[in-house]
């Protein structure tokens, strides 16, 4: 049995309280490409407009990240991929990744993180350094979470 059961459950006859509905309004979820592959349709389990963060773990190819972003966006959700500074080799790599996200999935938001690795794989070790490249402004990103 998986950690999370993504199968749609039959609805109960008991309605959620207004307080609970208010609390849950605007929530977000996080997926990884390999978990997203096991979800037949996000539309069956998520309300329209949910923000979906896509976790970028070390070793996950950018192509898998972009494919997941494209799929989630096509299903009608706001996509916010993780950009872990310490696994991005250099500014050219960052620009390439941003171009792929924008060109293939129309992404204009991102979560900037230092990342889970201790030793940087390249020029960046913090999310601030990603911001300092100026690429997010140049490329028209509308929302960044740091």
Q: Whereabouts are the PLM-identified features?
A:
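Active-site beta->alpha loop and helix N-cap motifs at the rims of alpha/beta catalytic domains
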Residues: 2, 7-146
